Amino acid sequence: MYKAFLFFILWYNQRLFVTSLSQNSPSLKEIKICTVMDQAGYTPVSALGEFRLIDRMTEKFSSYHEQVVRGIGDDAAVVKTADGMVDVISTDLLVEKVHFDLSYVPLKLLGYKSVIVNLSDVVAMNAHPYGITVSVGVSNRFPVEALDELYAGIHQACQQYKVNLLGGDTTSSKVGLVISITAIGRSKEEKIVYRSGAQKNDLICVSGDLGGAYAGYLVLERERRVLLDKPELQPD
């Protein structure tokens, strides 16, 4: 009896689902299923670059809420809050073999960096970051201890900058390690600094060693190539 009832529920839900698809989905003639890489006349993403691609993907989107002061187009979005302040929201995605190489990047350092690159966007808008969400896609080649190391770096960054971990998501991945972090900050609306606010003769101040990170990257890449060619040189 129970199995028959369960089958009926599944059958009925499937009917509702198919009906919904037929009423709300485009017709098959409107759906193009193709492998883009095999088709002539398509534009490669590299031909546009990051910002032109973002403009193209988002040009049809509108703002439906008056509390959204600034959406796409700056370091972070700006949203009014009930207390007269604004929340500043930014997100970044880090993908293995694109943004980092685990052959020379320690997981703890990667966790720390993944937080910092998001907090920097909030700070660039002259807001004070107070929270982050962390979403991780991880393949089965990573043991629990590896994730412990990753989150140790995330925890270190949260401690250093007094930022709360607000939540996130964890899922499996077939392409290695993927990290997505959203950072949220707060400021007075009149204190927000936009990219468009830069003026001629403004003073630009920087800290640290300009080009130091890139120089270090070149050294690490050189050493990685050497070890691939001569694995016997790998240190104990």
Locations of the language-model features?
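Serine residues within intrinsically disordered or low-complexity segments
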Residues: 20-27
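Helix-biased detector of long, well-ordered alpha-helical tracts
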Residues: 16, 30-236
